[in-house]
């Protein structure tokens, strides 16, 4: 969640111009992808999203993720990240999850329909 005193535009601008760079610094040796997804309203009847950004980091394997987390847990990294996050996030409301992905092969589904 963004800090309440920031507009959505200010939040996104800071994230993409400053905080993203820190993410890249610590993630680039280990991660395959570093993605930020910002919610948009999809029209009439759309719910207001309960978050300001969904950040995804893709790793080749669990060991790569552990290596990235170790780099980001180092004292200097923690200090640098925390200082920047205070400019951007309501840190008490930030949530993190590790998930397992299941992907459908839609090309195979299409071939089954023929």
Describe each model-derived feature in a short phrase.
Residues 1-114:
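Macromolecular interaction modules
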